[in-house]
């Protein structure tokens, strides 16, 4: 059981999406992709939540909260997004972990 599950929180996942050239997209394209994602999230219901995403040159790394990997794959399929790798976050660390 992860720390989040012990605290009664939804599991958290990092999704790696291979999207060549995505880092060159402009604000309008990113807005459209975000709107598509949010539309699918609304259809799937409140049990899946998009936290945020990191856009790099050729990949997007998304952080989601969801009860399972399956619903994340469903979101990707419905939205037309790749989900090349999905991993569950076991715990988080930051500089305060060193204290």
Language-model segments: residues:
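Short S/T/G/P-rich N-terminal loop/turn motif that feeds into the first structured element of a domain
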Residues: 1-42, 49, 94-99
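Short secondary-structure capping/turn micro-motifs that flank functional sites
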Residues: 57, 92-93
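Short amphipathic alpha-helical patches
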Residues: 38, 60-64, 68, 84, ...
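A short linear hydrophobic-aromatic micro-motif
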Residues: 46-52, 85
């Amino acid at each position: 059981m992860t720390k989040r599950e012990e605290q009664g929180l939804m599991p958290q996942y990092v999704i790696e999406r291979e999207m060549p050239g995505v880092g060159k997209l402009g604000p309008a394209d990113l807005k459209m992709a975000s709107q598509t994602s949010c539309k699918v999230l609304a259809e799937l219901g409140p049990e899946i939540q998009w936290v945020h995403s990191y856009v790099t040159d050729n990949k997007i790394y998304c952080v989601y909260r969801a009860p399972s990997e399956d619903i994340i794959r469903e979101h990707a399929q419905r939205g037309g997004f790749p989900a090349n790798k999905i991993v569950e976050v076991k715990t988080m660390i930051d500089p305060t972990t060193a204290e």
